[in-house]
Amino acid sequence: MEGHGAQRSSPLARDLTRAFTSYNKHTVLLKKNLKETHAFFREMRQNYSNTCASSTLSSDSSSQETGQFSCISFPSHEEEFLRNTVGAAPYILVLGQDCAARYQLLNCLLGDRLLPLGPEAGQACHGGQGNVCKRRKLCFTHGRQTRLSLALPGQYELVHQLAANCGRWETVPREDLEILDECEDPAHRQAELEITLHHPLLQEAKVMVVPCPSVQPIEEALEDCTRSVIPIILYAVNRDSLSSEQVADLRKVKEILSFPVCYVRLPDASAASAELGQRCEKDKSKLQKQLLSRGLLGSLSGNCSCGAPAQTAAPGAKPQSVVGENFEKLHRILVPFTRQVLQNQQVEAASLLNGLHCRCLDLFINQAFDMQRDLQITPRRLEYTREKEGELFTSLMTIANRKQEEMKDMIVETLGSMKEQLLEDAANLEFTDIIVTTNGDPVTSKEIKSCIQQIQDLIVVRLNQAVANKLISSVDYLRESFVGTLERCLSSLEKSHIESSVHNITSNHLKQLLNAAYHVEVTFHSGSSVTRLFWEQIKQIIHRITFVNPPAITPEWKRKVAQDAIESLSAAKLARSICSQFRTRLYSSHEAFAASLRQLEERHTGRLERTEDLWLRVRKDHAPRLARLSLESRSLRDVVLHGKPKLGRELGRGQYGVVYLCDSWGGHNPCALKSVVPPDDKHWNDLALEFHYTRTLPKHERLVDLHGSVIDHTYAGGSSIAVLLIMERLHRDLYTGLKAGLSLQERLQIALDVVEGIRFLHSQGLLHRDIKLKNVLLDKQNRAKITDLGFCKPEAMMSGSIVGTPIHMAPELFTGKYDNSVDVYAFGILFWYLCAGSVKLPEAFEKCSSKDQLWNNVRKGARPERLPCFDEECWQLMEACWNGDPSQRPLLGIVEPSLESITVRMCNCGSEQKSSSLEDSC
């Protein structure tokens, strides 16, 4: 064979080459996406680990951030699968019943008689004992020159004189294929024959022909194909059935490589090919029945004469083993089988990668919502806590200042009602730890003091309990109206700022201050401030009672001691003392609370600054970058699965892309294709986020379905990259529909459809921001669907950019601070067109000569005029929707039933007179 020049290529080889070329091209993109994903995750981990290391004063903030983004990584099993799959080299593995079958199939693949067949092949593999075939493994690779060499697998080339190198050859010499019996060199016996050819198929994939079983067991021969290889396993069959040894080998292949097998039935030299074809068409061959019975072939609903499945497998379906019964039609089964195996691996890898992108992107978006809420709610909570504490302090001080006289009267009343009972209880008091004689003989001075102390304690306990119960009722209402709310708000602030043990002590101290100063639990058991002050004051007064001579301990004496103690109490002084000390402690607690709250606020301020910085990074960098990776992985999956869509005629042009007709793609027919060429990274990021928001939305009948996306790297001759968004094709847009004419009932139904679609978007946390006539599409029944979610974003991901169509833009859009009420405003303008029944601009907008003038007029309050044909209720609804104050615009949950009632009133039977003005005049 000539050492230079490309090999001839058969139609089978050309189609296989195209399949492998497509696989390798997509593999490059998949590897790039995986590499960038790894780099992104690595950068995220480094950034947040550095943030944690530097945030020594705010371990809570750092732990919050790391907790939020700890799942920004590959699960171990997914990482292992991607490592083994992405970038795996395609290999055609040629197995067979014997060497003759394998060689015949290899020659068919390459379209040339490279390996010897027939008599020149020599001894068959199933020769008699003593004549066992010993042909080595063959590896076909690509090279500019044709050459043969012996090499140890994965190691080095052996210096050995091959017969092929001694002269010209067309077929590989038989002696180079075999291991001679006299060869005793173990390296030479283990070596494989590497055949380098300048063949298009070998440029895209390597080919390996397994050796004879006597040379190397099948499990050892396939050992190198278990890692980073995608094998296309072909099994050549040249007899009607398989031997038990061959079935066992196939089971081993199935265990080693979890890939399907294509069984190729080779023509039998002893039977005419026409006769063989007729036999295949009549019934399943003996081979196919054997493979089915041994579990080596999946059950098939029906095959054509070539052995290929009668029905094409669904896109993305797991490939199954197949049998090619007709060698003349091998092309019809082998090429689809190869494509399906290659496609399945790439689709699975791209889907797994895209699933990871979407999970992490959803995490970023959810965290953006949480951070935005934290930034909004924490300052309000702090202000609310300060305000409510001030109200509580003022209320308690009012009680201390104004309730003194009430306390005095309450104490006098309590003493008066309890006096006789107290005296009786004191007279009957049994002293503890003191022995008193029955005749009341005098005792020592020390025992007298103990008796007096016990009588005092009795009076103090009874009075304290009675007065405390009445004090509680005077301030008890504060507990629920102030303290309960304060505690809940404070608890939420503390939970969002648990930083360290030191800061826990501060938070606990703040709680203790509230419990001690403001709960006003003046029961005896709690030992609260007011009760304790009252008790101490009583003790001080009673202790001033003196006794000169030790008296006899009699009931009369006990009664006298109790009487003197009660009469010594001054209700006025006691009330004044209680209120004075209560005020002092209130003020002290108020100051301590305020200081602690300021300290907590300072810490929250630092945390919120870090949160806002992180929120900006998520919105501006992290989420857009990840969205772009997600768009690329999803588009790669779609193009592998469904191919590149074919562009039809142009349907329309917009600010950011061109819309084409697409007859069929991915099982959808017909489709619309939006071609977008992002000019810079910002537009790329916006488009990627749009695609993510749209694709992750559940299907809804009022939204246009997005079927998929494909990134066209060959756009404009490869100078630009275009993103092709394939979506549902509808009949026309609302602008065209209004120009053609729509009935009143159709227009009101369209209004209801649009409101339903916007409500669904809002329920998913999204704003459309560009509701207008061109973005509402109509089907053949004139039912509406919202399209073009190019400006659609969650509130938490909005950066305040000014987007939309000027006529439909709410005034607050120009300030950059807005919410989902901008869609209500835009609907109000859209509803004006629907009620007008035409596309003529309102007078207020028609006279504007430029976009800037139009914006200025909208900001100044310019709105569409009322047309004579407008129904009063419709006009009121429009005005409410485009109200300049966003808070005054109605919720869509109110707009929808209003529209329904308008529709029922104006379109039902008997309402022709009411609706005739709208129907006829506009």
Curated annotation (Swiss-Prot):
Keyword rRNA processing in annotation: no
EC class (word): transferase
Disulfide-bonded cysteines: none
Known function: May act as a positive regulator of ERK phosphorylation downstream of fibroblast growth factor-receptor activation. May induce both caspase-dependent apoptosis and caspase-independent cell death. May play a role in the embryonic development.
Main localization category: cytoplasm
E.C. no: 2.7.12.1
Keywords: ATP-binding, Cell junction, Cell membrane, Cytoplasm, Developmental protein, Kinase, Membrane, Nucleotide-binding, Serine/threonine-protein kinase, Transferase, Tyrosine-protein kinase
Cellular location(s): Cytoplasm; Cell membrane; Apical cell membrane; Basolateral cell membrane
Protein name (Swiss-Prot/TrEMBL): Dual serine/threonine and tyrosine protein kinase
Catalysed reactions listed for this entry: L-seryl-[protein] + ATP = O-phospho-L-seryl-[protein] + ADP + H(+); L-threonyl-[protein] + ATP = O-phospho-L-threonyl-[protein] + ADP + H(+); L-tyrosyl-[protein] + ATP = O-phospho-L-tyrosyl-[protein] + ADP + H(+)
InterPro entries the record matches: Dual_SerThr-Tyr_Kinase (IPR051302), Kinase-like_dom_sf (IPR011009), Prot_kinase_dom (IPR000719), Protein_kinase_ATP_BS (IPR017441), Ser/Thr_kinase_AS (IPR008271)
Pfam families per UniProt: Pkinase
Binding site for ATP: L651, G652, R653, G654, Q655, Y656, G657, V658, V659, K674
Molecular function per GO: ATP binding; protein serine kinase activity; protein serine/threonine kinase activity; protein serine/threonine/tyrosine kinase activity; protein tyrosine kinase activity
Similarity annotation: Belongs to the protein kinase superfamily. Ser/Thr protein kinase family.
GO cellular component, one term: basolateral plasma membrane
Domain named Protein kinase: residues: 645-899
Catalytic residues as annotated in Swiss-Prot or TrEMBL: D770 (proton acceptor)
Lineage: Eukaryota, Metazoa, Chordata, Craniata, Vertebrata
One example of a Gene Ontology biological process annotation: negative regulation of apoptotic process
